[in-house]
């Protein structure tokens, strides 16, 4: 196995995952979203209302990127932005009803993706993969 191709392999896997996610979203009638919106929506599925700052930290993106992504989600009707009662310079983000309706779709797609990723890989190997990828991430 060529160890010097690790970055290319990781990039290829990411591309395949993104393609799978877009295809599955389209099959479920969800259009206009990019895979980068998934991390934001997933965080909001697990946290009712968050500040833009906390959302940026949670998805490990800078605030300007998150602002653009949230703007698209607002335009699509999936989230809304509210002024913070604690800090007038800060905004809160929460799912709309339309955004909440995405939750089961995202969970189903996520479960099917994980099943596909781990197909033919036993639990010991899965743990090894996760451990090694974490080490690679920490090295960078």
Model-derived features with residue positions:
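N-terminal positioning helix adjacent to the helix-turn-helix/winged-helix DNA-binding module
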Residues: 2, 6, 36-37, 98, ...
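A structural signal for well-ordered alpha-helices, especially hydrophobic packing surfaces
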Residues: 14, 103, 137-140
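N-terminal leader segment of winged-helix/HTH proteins
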Residues: 1-31, 95
